[in-house]
Amino acid sequence: MKILVLNSGSSSIKFQLFLMEENRSIASGIVEQIGSENSRAVLKANSKEYEKKRAIKDHHEGLDVMNELFRESNTLHDLSELDGIGHRIVHGGESFFSSMIVDDSVIAKIEQISPLAPLHNPGHIAGIKNAMQSSGDVPHVVVFDTVFHQTMPEYAYRYALPYDICKEHHIRKYGFHGTSHRYVCKRAASLMGMEFQNFNAISLHLGNGASACAVQNGKSIDTSMGLSPLEGLIMGTRSGDMDPAVVVYLLNIGVLKWDEIDTFLNKKSGLFGICGSSDMRDVVTRMANDERAKLAFEMFCYRVKKYIGAYYAVLGHVDALIFTGGIGENAPNTRQKICDDLKHLGIHVNHDLNFSKERGERCLDDKNAKIKTFVIPTNEELEIAIETMRVIKERAKI
């Protein structure tokens, strides 16, 4: 069974082809700078790289070039050969509680909630429509980053703002990175020999974007990101949690203008705002001689630690703490700082295991730990492929 996963942005298409009998990627690539003269498409397969450079005017043409690369690499001759195509969708709003087979009504709902994700959902829609035109009768499935968090209770997702306004305008915590949190929690449960529906965990997706998730009995019951990915942890360029009155104050004294707020909070804050770098590797390198870099590191780790404590209190019993994402997987200094002084919670990270050069899925805790600590490399594309296959098979039973 072959499943193609597409992540269509406003000017790019990321893609990965999976052989589902082995849960194995057999080809991956990207079509980038769509709509410019400098468009480029790259595919990696069979330990080789295939590339085409030429102007690509739109997503339809981008998919045509992707097809050319598939044929050239002999991994796929036509999209109609596929058993399914899975599409990553950033925001499902309150309309979607599970992954869905795509039809006209699904596309219409995604278009309707695009104001909640104006930078992402329009590109997703363009990818879906063009892929459907190019793939014959192949079923398409949409997999939402927000769906995993739809199991949060209302007292966790509702904001303490005027209730009627929030209901009318769909203002609430939605959460993101759901596909990643679900994947790594499923893997950790499997490594512990536990059924996912009995598994409790605190999942930390730490990268340029970062979020925490409390998982109880295999379901998300709270997460740090909110209406947008801006809430919660300190990130590369995003502020995370802050007093909203800061923005009002800066507007009142003339430091900010209304049209500068989004850029200020999303692109000029976080690690970058504190020390001038959004890259945790650079921050760690500079810490010894740069007080601001040290401050950024300590603020980042402190914020994560606070969320661990909060989610421990909410969950009561925790089976595992999971690190994933670029920082979570590759920054032992950050993991160590976060886990230091958490022994009273049962989290004991072994220093040598944490700083080992070993990669891939691994356990970091020592013999005194009551809570397992894992590093699990995320694989959102594989999780989307698995979800796509599940939805298609369920439809076939009807």
Swiss-Prot record:
Could you name the Gene Ontology cellular component terms for this entry? cytoplasm
Major enzyme class: transferase
Q: Quote the PROSITE patterns the UniProt record gives.
A: ACETATE_KINASE_1, ACETATE_KINASE_2
Provide the protein's localization: Cytoplasm
Q: How does it assemble?
A: Homodimer.
Reactions this protein catalyses: acetate + ATP = acetyl phosphate + ADP
* Official protein name in the record: Acetate kinase
- Marked site: Transition state stabilizer: H177, R238
Q: Where does substrate bind?
A: R88
Cofactor annotation remark: Mg(2+). Can also accept Mn(2+).
Q: Keyword set for this entry?
A: ATP-binding, Cytoplasm, Kinase, Magnesium, Metal-binding, Nucleotide-binding, Transferase
Q: One GO MF term, please?
A: acetate kinase activity
Catalytic site positions: D145 (proton donor/acceptor)
PANTHER family assigned to the protein according to its UniProt record, in alphabetical order:
ACETATE KINASE (PTHR21060), ACETATE KINASE-RELATED (PTHR21060:SF15)
Question: What does the record give as EC number?
Answer: 2.7.2.1
- What role is this protein assigned? Catalyzes the formation of acetyl phosphate from acetate and ATP. Can also catalyze the reverse reaction.
- Known pathway: Metabolic intermediate biosynthesis; acetyl-CoA biosynthesis; acetyl-CoA from acetate: step 1/2
GO biological process, alphabetically ordered: acetate metabolic process; acetyl-CoA biosynthetic process
Would the keyword Metal-binding be found if you checked this record's keyword annotation?
yes
Report the sequence similarity comment from the record: Belongs to the acetokinase family.
Q: Which residues bind Mg(2+)?
A: N7, E380
**CDD domains per the record?**
ASKHA_NBD_AcK_PK
